[in-house]
Amino acid sequence: MSHQMAPWIPMFIQSCKNNTEPFVSFQFATVDELTNKPRCRTVVFRDFLFHDKRTNVLTFNTDMRSSKITESFITPNSNNSSDSKRCETPFFEACFYFPETWEQYRFSGQCFTISKQFKKIPAEIVTKYDIFSPRFSETNDDSTDEEIDTPINDDDDDDKNNDADNNDINEDNKLIESIENDEHHEDEDDYYPQPQEWEAELLRQWSSLSRHTKSLYRKPAPGQKLTSETSKQLDKLHRGVDGAKEDAGLENFGIVCLCVDSVDFLNLKEGRGGERWIFQKTDGKDEDLWEEQEVCP
């Protein structure tokens, strides 16, 4: 079993650290499964999967009712029930640009989602990208702490007084603790994340959101027609009097995970008119390997 950090990760982390904006935003593009038309939107980088840069998996948060999910992550005319609904793994391209350092990263690969709605993570993408259980990564001292300040921890002061609402997910927190203390893993399949570990990651990222951000997942579905009723709902949310508990939006919350196959890095501030590197993932016998090639910018 190998769990190694890709060679482009340190460069990317440093670029994020050099960013002075409150968020690291980027463009995320997929192809609509039904129309075969390209779709692109701006999203916010949240963290590495399981808060471990060695997964080489980037994440951002999304509303599972949004068009990006129906366009790319759900098979057209699927009749799967909610309990057995399968997450698709579409190809993607993502582009980060850091204007202060004139650096650009273009990522391509496959992606999947973690949510209450998608109970099953496709095993083929987990094994293809060697996404190992966080139980193994937690034994290593390497982490993203103090290396990259992503907006995953965007709590506001009001959240500190949320004891009543937080009691609603105490059982979920116990789940996370039980996973961290679990040392039983004998089968090869145990190297990969178990269902409760995917759920724990969902709760970790959800719990790190501010009260305001959580409220966005209680809004009417994105793209829904604006009526007098939906206007009232939005107004109540804006004033904080909608009457719903803070975690009511968890059902609509999802994490999109970007599994990277290739990286095109361009640095226009570097001498000699800039520099450009291509990183390409290759499948080794026992571990994933990366080929690096400097090319003309």
UniProtKB/Swiss-Prot annotation:
An annotated Gene Ontology molecular function: FMN binding
Region entry Disordered, spans: 136-174
Listed GO CC annotations: cytoplasm; nucleus
Comp. bias regions, Acidic residues: 139-170
Family matches, as Pfam families: Pyridox_oxase_2
Source organism superkingdom: Eukaryota
Signal peptide: none
InterPro entries noted in UniProt: Pyridox_Oxase_Alr4036_FMN-bd, Split_barrel_FMN-bd
Additional remarks: Present with 2840 molecules/cell in log phase SD medium.
Family: To S.pombe SpBC725.03.
PANTHER family from the UniProt entry: AGL049CP (PTHR28243), PYRIDOXAMINE 5'-PHOSPHATE OXIDASE ALR4036 FAMILY FMN-BINDING DOMAIN-CONTAINING PROTEIN (PTHR28243:SF1)
Protein name stated in the entry: Uncharacterized protein YGR017W
